[in-house]
Amino acid sequence: MSALPIATNHYFDTHFDRPGVKLLPNEFYTTSEDIVLMTVLGSCVAACLHDPVSGIGGMNHFMLPDDGADAGAAASESMRYGAYAMEVLINELIKAGGRRERFEAKVFGGAAVLAGMTTINIGDRNADFVRRYLALERIRITAEDLQGVHPRKVAFMPRTGRAMVKKLRLQVPGVAEREAALAREAVRASAARARAKVELFAAPRPSAPPPARPRIELFGARSGGAGVQPAVQKAASPYAANLSRK
């Protein structure tokens, strides 16, 4: 298998006044440095894991849940699937000194960005998957902002576990095109599974745990673009929400 798709887009974030790394779909990043990890999500999901004792944290960005991953595929292709993306993130954090039993999770994304795509439900499937996966791994979700119809911009500070989210306008350049491609991929994967005609015998999947109810603070964005306030809690500012550790 090829090298793991670690995010390489480094920059300096003027809003948070610290170095940052931008994650694209299928990428991940882990570190104990005082930086910010940033990504933009539609139906995709980003899981942010943090060990509050060691100060190590990381983020991934996956596009589809646990369907269709090929054990012989390149790592960059496998990372699009949640099962592989979560396994990589957890394992890399453990390699860096984190302890699984201390991990805390904050999860974002899973929006229904494309109108009329209710039959595929990529966002709902991704949201349900990440909740079930973390429940099975006994990793507590301390905050979440999942589903809905708006794309999100997520910032995560891996050293402290602080996470912030901003709801974006429905029509964000590049997001709609990516969502359309995801819908085509989901249809292709479904057709491939039907052709395989493999019957699996397994225990019923556990239902997803109830959504986390985090405390949310809001912060302003320098860009000045109006965001949509999360439905979890009303707040004064119309910008991004701070999902703090406590």
From Swiss-Prot:
Disordered: region residues: 225-246
Molecular-function GO terms, alphabetical: protein-glutamine glutaminase activity
Keywords, ordered alphabetically: Chemotaxis, Hydrolase
Disulfide bonds: none
Pfam families the record matches: CheD
Reaction catalysed by this enzyme: L-glutaminyl-[protein] + H2O = L-glutamyl-[protein] + NH4(+)
GO biological process per UniProt: chemotaxis
Gene3D superfamilies referenced in this protein's UniProt entry, alphabetically: 3.30.1330.200
EC numbers: 3.5.1.44
Record function comment: Probably deamidates glutamine residues to glutamate on methyl-accepting chemotaxis receptors (MCPs), playing an important role in chemotaxis.
Family: Belongs to the CheD family.
The protein, known as: Probable chemoreceptor glutamine deamidase CheD
Lineage, opening ranks: Bacteria, Pseudomonadati, Pseudomonadota, Betaproteobacteria, Burkholderiales
